From Swiss-Prot:
Keyword Oxidoreductase: no
One MF term in the entry's GO annotations: structural molecule activity
Organism name: Toxoplasma gondii
Extent of the HEAT repeats: 51-89, 94-129, 130-166, 247-284, 322-359, 365-404, 405-441
Full protein name: Coatomer subunit beta
One biological process term in Gene Ontology: intra-Golgi vesicle-mediated transport
Topology of this chain in the membrane: Peripheral membrane protein
Major site of localization recorded for this protein: cytoplasm
InterPro entries: ARM-like, ARM-type_fold, Clathrin/coatomer_adapt-like_N, Coatomer_bsu_C, COPB1, COPB1_appendage_platform_dom
Sorted UniProt keywords: Cytoplasm, Cytoplasmic vesicle, ER-Golgi transport, Golgi apparatus, Membrane, Protein transport, Repeat, Transport
Subunit-level organization: Oligomeric complex that consists of at least the alpha, beta, beta', gamma, delta, epsilon and zeta subunits.
GO cellular component: COPI vesicle coat; Golgi membrane
Subcellular localization: Cytoplasm; Golgi apparatus membrane; Cytoplasmic vesicle, COPI-coated vesicle membrane
């Protein structure tokens, strides 16, 4: 039978026993067509289930094939498809002559359906002796009047030529080509062209070129009139020919470009993908990007949009920014979709290609979208707040890169600090602070708006940022007077008292006695479980809570225990009053002049040394131009007295507060310093003047260090954009150039890695470094250009974190070191004295884990049926069990067990191995040692900002608390080792530019659809990052001069699970470190796994 070659159906039969041959013969010979059809159906079902029924072939030929009933005819053709046509010796059965005659009659039938279905049957037959007498009839159907017959005739001809060669039908190509010129049915034309593509690609190319020369439109009219199916077949031909014949590539690519604007979406997508895979010319990439942009705006399906955005991301990586900049507005039209993920990817793409020519248009669109999110009807739309935060981050990125364009969005941004969403308001406040520091031409305008919006601020951090901005950059006496008046009014009535809680004391004085109201709320306990707590709140007689009875948000926060805000109010007011002094103004002017001279000297050294890659901050350039200079402010005696009284009231409130502030708290000390500065200004004491000089001068330079240290946005693209442009690695003229293709020990490395990882596919862009805010490209394997990459050898040594040494460049390590690194990961899982010695190597490749086991026969006997039976514990799934092997004495074998990893939950691989000795029927069994999955293999080094960290910390529910227990006595060494062993990064601190440039598209190499992938590439990058962490001033000062140390860390697993870590350490008098490490995550698995990892790491530390 033909079941092994062609079986188009398998129907389950509920009958217990298969019908006998006699029963089926009786039904088939019946004159009733329904009975005959039932018999044919039972015959086909029986044959597909293994019954032979060889004696019924002649019965079917005599009684079923001549039938005119459509159902019987169709069942007969299905029978002919599966029936055996040859004898056991391979010769054709005699009955096939009768079948050929019947098939010929069907090919000449006046019924078009019979002809078409017969042609479909013949395309599935693989015996040429059956087809040979029917070739003439098949070719005659190529010119049949009905398209259904011609369509199937073309596919039948293609099947014959494909299986038996062109010699089976010598004139096939000529007839197909003539058919293409006169065919009107689009599907038939597409089938005919496919025959030329697969059987005679040269003739297909000649046909296309001939149409281009004969058509006045360059072949475009012919192609557009041929339909989308024909165009898809043409694209398949062009991809095939362009890779084989480079001399014709340019003309064929122009043909693809010409058909993109006027085709259906399917053709446009395939054509753009073809251009992307075949060419890197700017014209081709621009045409492909234009087609993708049209598809993005013209489709409503979010899945289509995401796929198109992945392709656009690939265009961005291959093309220059100037080439892609013209598509900024086209991409922004896609923001009309309600999908937040689509919007995020669009904004990421736009931020990568925006330039000076398009930034104004981009900011106008972002401003319009921001205003639209503030409309009342938009507040009910899901995830509107998240979309607003994305827009604000995009505006921040544009303003950071193009400060001259920030004027158009300042007014809109300043309206958002009063937003009810604390994350959005804080993000806007930080953006405005940076604009004030960097955009001198907008400073007075921004400060004026900040003063007006100050009373509307409803969040403590927004108030602190606003106060700091006004204290540093308020350069107008009228604004100073307005601001000080607003602050004094917001803090009134004075003085503060420790018993005052949002107006409760005032109510008591007025005779309105407050009552206590108990509220029960749900909280998350330390162990991650839920609990409840009772909160008592004072309520007045009108039913309003005391917290809501306060006049202003500023007073409410101060009375509620926000002592940092209280100290900020005191410092800001004192600093502004100090700037009104002639002596302080002269000191500030002298300090700025000295700083400007230092900047000029530094710039001169850069010019002399020719260090064109050195970077000057925008603030330094403005100081060189003389745009940043201290301004003399004026304040009335009444304002000075008010400020002194306010600061004194704040100090008294902090010292007498029962909420834990006290006289020795940081906030109280800072307020006391403000009071000393004001007293020094008014009393004129020389000791106090020296304190004022030290206290006032360095605030603005602190902001510069903050802006240089870390990002204010969690958009990774804004972190490394300037670094990637300005801080390029320059090689010395005498540096050696390494070529991977000329390495002498390449073969030895391949031998060392044999059986572990095959050479994979990747783009030819291995020598260029790409990074995107939207990681994870959906790349078509059939369209990718194939080359060997270093990522394959990186995966060979195991680990998703990327710890393998680089194989190219001046820092390339020996292949022997790479082999030693892999050898160190081998773990024995049986003993040396056991009959079978088994050792395992865990090769991690993203979501897959391959257990490679070396099995060695240590006995002098032959061992048969050696079977390793692995099993898994945790979120692991065994994909395939190793096959049994037989081992001679001393022989060894390598077995593989692929395992699918679904999460970072701690997993264990265990099992046993069974075998039997020759001549013995008893089976022996050895229990294997456990293999623990290292969570570090699935945790990547990622970066995030403080705002995103706080938002996730408040949102995540699972928490794992670990007590610090280590022999380290130096905090910085402990932190460095902890980060190195867990792939954690410092929150809010961006990596060096050299690390960011080496971040690759790991999604393109691993085939993942994940967004924002960033992992350190190699041990050198890891060391470079850890060295940069040591230089963070705040961490260095804490570790050197403080007995308490706290830092936030972050990482993400390859499964997209965020891990938030808070390290709080206290240095005891004896030098021992104590404290806790808190881990929070959205899921329980990564919190527990990372906690176990940290516990093992810190316990195993030795100084």
């Amino acid at each position: 039978m033909e079941l092994e070659r062609n079986c188009m159906l398998y129907i389950y039969s509920s009958r217990g026993d298969a019908p006998s041959t006699a029963e089926l013969q009786k039904k088939i010979e019946s004159p009733n067509e329904a009975t005959k059809a039932e018999g044919m159906q039972d015959l086909i079902i029986g044959m597909t289930q293994g019954e032979a029924y060889t004696r019924l072939l002649m019965t079917v030929i005599r009684y079923a094939m001549p039938s005119k009933d459509k159902r019987v005819k169709k069942l007969t053709q299905l029978y002919l498809e599966i029936v055996g046509k040859c004898r056991p010796d391979g010769s054709l059965k005699e009955e096939m002559i009768l079948i050929c005659n019947a098939l010929r009659n069907d090919l000449m039938s006046p019924n078009e359906y019979v002809r078409g279905s017969t042609l479909r049957l013949l395309s599935k037959i693989r015996q040429f002796k059956v087809l040979e007498p029917l070739v003439e009839a098949i070719l005659q159907n190529l010119t049949h009047r009905h398209s259904y017959v011609r369509r199937n005739a073309v596919m039948c001809v293609y099947s014959i030529v494909k299986n038996f060669g062109l010699d089976a039908i010598p004139a096939t190509i000529d007839q197909i080509e003539q058919m293409l010129l006169s065919e009107g049915d689009l599907t038939t034309k597409r089938n005919a062209f496919l025959v030329l593509v697969h059987c005679a690609s040269k003739r297909a190319i000649q046909f296309i070129l001939q149409q281009r020369s004969e058509d006045g439109t360059g072949g475009l009219g012919f192609l557009l009139s041929s339909g989308d199916l024909f165009q898809l077949a043409l694209l398949e031909l062009l991809r095939k020919v362009c890779r084989q014949k480079q001399q014709q590539k340019a003309g064929l690519l122009r043909l693809i470009v010409s058909i993109l604007p006027n085709t259906l979406p399917s053709v446009a997508y395939e054509g753009a993908c073809s251009l992307l895979a075949l060419s890197r010319a700017p014209v081709s990439l621009k045409a492909a990007a234009g087609a993708f942009a049209s598809l993005l705006c013209g489709n409503s399906d979010n899945n289509v949009k995401l796929i198109v955005l992945d392709r656009l991301q690939e265009c961005v990586q291959r093309a220059s920014r100037r080439t892609m900049e013209e598509f900024v507005i086209d991409l922004l039209r896609g923001l009309q979709t309600p999908s937040l993920e689509v919007r995020r990817k669009i904004l990421d793409l736009v931020l990568q290609i925006v330039g000076k020519n398009s930034v104004e248009q981009l900011l106008n669109v972002l401003k319009r979208e921001l205003l639209r999110t503030a409309e009342p009807e938009q507040l009910t739309v899901p995830r509107t707040m998240e979309y607003r935060r994305l827009l604000i981050k995009a505006v921040h990125s544009c303003c950071t890169r193009f400060p001259e364009a920030a004027a158009s969005v300042v007014n809109v941004l300043i309206d958002f600090p009063g937003d009810p969403d604390v994350t959005t308001a804080t993000e806007v406040a930080v953006v405005v602070r940076e604009l004030v520091a960097t955009c001198v031409h907008l400073r007075s305008r921004i400060i004026s708006r900040v003063v007006d919006a100050f009373p509307d601020s409803a969040h403590a951090r927004v108030l602190r940022v606003s106060l700091w901005m006004l204290g540093e950059f308020c350069e107008d006496s009228e604004l100073l007077d307005s601001f000080l008046t607003a602050v004094y009014a917001a803090c009134s009535p004075l003085p503060f008292t420790s018993g005052d809680s949002g107006g409760a004391e005032g109510e008591q004085r007025s005779g309105c006695q407050p009552k206590l109201k108990m509220t029960t709320r749900t909280v998350v306990l330390e162990d991650g479980t839920y609990g409840t707590e009772d909160v008592y709140e004072s309520v007045n007689e009108k039913g309003d809570s005391s917290a809501k009875a306060g006049k202003t948000a500023l007073r409410k926060f101060i009375l509620g225990g926000d002592f940092l805000l209280a100290s900020t109010v005191a410092v800001t007011c004192a600093k502004l009053i100090l700037k009104t002094s002639d002596e302080v103004h002269a000191q500030l002017a002298e300090e700025f002049e000295r700083h400007r001279e230092a900047v000029q000297e530094k710039a001169g050294r850069r010019t002399l040394t020719g260090d064109a890659q050195a970077r000057e901050t925008l603030l330094e350039r403005q100081e060189l131009e003389g745009k940043v200079a201290p301004v003399k402010l004026r304040a009335s005696t009444e304002q000075k007295t008010r400020v002194l009284y306010l600061v004194a009231c704040l100090l008294k409130f902090l010292r007498l507060s029962s909420s834990g502030a006290g006289a020795h708290s940081d906030a109280a000390i800072r307020v006391c310093q403000s009071l000393r500065a004001l007293c020094g200004l008014m009393t004129g004491l020389e000791k106090e003047k020296a304190f004022v000089r030290h206290w006032v001068h360095h605030g603005r330079f602190a902001l510069e260090r903050v802006l240089a240290l870390g990002p204010v946005s969690d958009d990774p693209f804004t972190w490394n954009l300037k670094d990637a442009e300005d801080e390029k690695t320059v090689s010395a003229p005498d540096d050696l150039a390494f070529f991977r293709q000329l390495r002498p020990d390449r073969q030895s490395l391949m031998v060392a890695s044999e059986g572990v990882a095959a050479v994979g596919e990747d783009s030819l862009e291995e020598d260029e470094i790409y990074y995107s805010a939207c990681a994870g490209l959906a790349r078509g394997a059939e369209l990718e250009e194939v080359d060997e990459t270093e990522a394959d050898l990186q995966l060979t040594v195991g680990g998703a974190g990327g710890t393998s040494p680089s194989l190219s460049g001046g820092n390339a390590k020996d292949d022997a070191a790479l082999f030693q690194q892999r050898l160190a990961k081998v773990q024995p899982i049986t003993g040396q004295a056991d009959p079978l010695y088994v050792e395992a190597f865990l090769q991690v490749n993203q979501f897959d884990l391959l257990v490679e086991m070396l099995v060695v026969n240590r006995t002098q006997d032959s061992l048969q049926n050696v079977t390793v039976e692995p099993s898994t514990h945790g979120d692991l799934k065994l994909v395939e069990r190793p096959a049994p092997v037989s081992l001679a004495p001393g022989q060894q074998a390598v077995l593989h067990a692929p395992i699918k990893v679904r999460s970072t939950e701690a997993g264990i691989i265990l099992g046993y191995v069974t075998f039997s000795r020759r001549g013995s029927s008893d089976k022996e069994c050895l229990v294997l040692n456990e293999l623990h999955i290292d969570v570090l293999d699935y945790i990547e080094r990622r970066w995030t900002c403080e705002l995103a960290f706080r938002s996730m910390w408040a949102e995540f529910e699972w928490e794992n608390k670990i007590h610090v227990n280590t022999s380290f006595t130096d905090v910085s060494e402990f932190l460095e080792h902890l980060m190195k062993m867990t792939n954690l990064t410092v929150v809010g601190f961006r990596p060096p530019a050299s690390v960011m440039r080496r971040l690759k598209f790991s999604a393109a190499c691993a085939g993942l659809d994940e967004a924002e992938r960033a992992a350190g590439d190699g041990e050198e990058d890891e060391d470079r990052y850890l060295q940069s962490v040591r230089k963070i001033p705040t961490l260095r000062k804490l570790s050197e001069s403080s007995s308490f140390f706290a830092v936030n860390l972050y990482s993400r697993s390859i499964f997209g699970e965020d891990a938030l870590v808070n390290v709080s350490i206290e240095k005891l008098p004896g030098g021992k470190l104590a404290g806790s490490i808190r881990i929070r995550s959205r899921t329980q698995g990564i919190a527990l796994s990372l906690g176990d990892r940290i516990t093992v790491v810190q316990r195993g530390l030795t100084k």
